[in-house]
Amino acid sequence: MKEGLSRIPKALTIAGSDSGGGAGIQADLKTFQELDVYGMSAITAITVQNTLGVSGVYPLPPAAAAEQIRAVGSDLGVDALKTGMLFDAEIIRAVAAEIRRFRWKRVVVDPVMIAKGGETLLQQEAVAALREELLPLAQVVTPNIPEAEALSGLPIRTMQERREAAKRIRAMGPEIVVIKGGHDERDAEGGGTSRSSSPSGVEVVDLVYDGSHFTELVGLRVHTVHTHGTGCTFSAALAAALAKGAALQEAVRTARAFIQAAIEDSLELGHGHGPTNHWAYRRRQEVLL
């Protein structure tokens, strides 16, 4: 019997397009597919990029983003969604208005601000709109260290400072804050921070805060430059797990396992920061069966 569309888990990505395929909606849709979720997209901007960096950003009109979201929501339905690159305050407001229109609850906000090569993907004046318009609608927000600093207004050099930032960000509305540790090197005791590359085997700690408890998800840092799209992929995996009905903490752990596998088996493509391997997690699961 043909499976009805209403029974298929569906996830929407609202983000920019990456011509190199390693990040943005391309990474999100690959991740959804690998986790058996039907993927849909609303494009907010076209980026001209490859593994060497971003050479052009062309934001779409806010109305174009809103109409894409409305087309998906009014017909296909959305079990969970994630936002990525939103570029400016006008697009953020348009996206937030559509989320409110459909009263979607499983919302993952990846506050994309800076590309791997340092290019700006969110205008400075848009950070306030992100805090005020989008975070109150988020179930989960997934900043890296620099993004957490921008959202919280706090410098983050120690684990205690990361915890304080998580508290401040959660007060803006999201149910759970996940501050990713990929930009930091510290031990679980809250040591100092180094922004340099590190050898494999050094711990990387993602901090999860639900308003009552802090959870530290510890993994091994992988020594590779091929990490393009890690943030997009992590948040997409989290949204996919939520679309399938996973509880929040379970969804975070699924996303953590997915991105760990993707980084460990990352792809040596291009001449710069290559992409992660979106099929690595599925292949590992197949081996276990």
PLM region spans:
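Glycine- and other small-residue-rich loops at beta-strand/loop junctions that grip anionic moieties
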Residues: 17, 83-84, 119, 227
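Conserved N-terminal subdomain of the carbohydrate kinase-like
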Residues: 2-13, 25, 29-117
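Short, small-residue alpha-helix embedded
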Residues: 149-150, 225-248
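Phosphate-handling active-site elements
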Residues: 35-40, 214-215, 241-255
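Short beta-strands and strand-loop turn motifs
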Residues: 78-82, 108-116, 142-151, 179-180, ...
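Short pre-catalytic strand/loop immediately N-terminal to key active-site residues, enriched for Gly-Thr
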Residues: 14-20, 214-228
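Conserved phosphate/ATP/ADP-binding segment of small-molecule kinases
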Residues: 124-214
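Charged C-terminal helix
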Residues: 8, 59, 249-289
